[in-house]
Amino acid sequence: MNRSYSKESLSEIAGGDEDFMGVVAQTFLEEIPPDLAALQEAIDNDNKELAYQFAHKMKPNLEMFGIDVQKDVAAIENWTKSSKPNSAIEENITRLVSVLEVVFKELEEDFK
């Protein structure tokens, strides 16, 4: 079954330990949703400094799970250093949220 995250990448990091993979997945599910909400709020409020902090904080976790959103996170980070309005990254944050909502469901199914 195709997933929006890489179970192989997670398994490699966990040394194939299913229990540890479950712990890592649970930690991801506890930390990333509130960080994503805070990122969205920072973008909505045009708080570029805070948006950068949350995007940067989330990036290693997204990479660890092999979630293909690096371009969107990079676009958000680049926006924080620009004078562009938040509408310039509307597509990026929308795609990031959509992909992560799917990943959250998949992780909940895979690591009940």
Residue ranges and their predicted role:
Residues 14, 18, 32, 43, ...:
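Flexible interhelical turns and helix-capping residues at alpha-helix boundaries
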Residues 16, 39, 43-51, 80-87:
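Short helix-adjacent coil turns
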Residues 58:
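An anion-binding catalytic pocket shared by soluble metabolic enzymes
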Residues 2-4, 24, 28-30, 61-75, ...:
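Amphipathic, coiled-coil-like alpha-helical segments
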Residues 10-22, 52-55:
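Short, charged, low-complexity loops and linkers
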Residues 1-5, 9-13:
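Extended low-complexity intrinsically disordered regions
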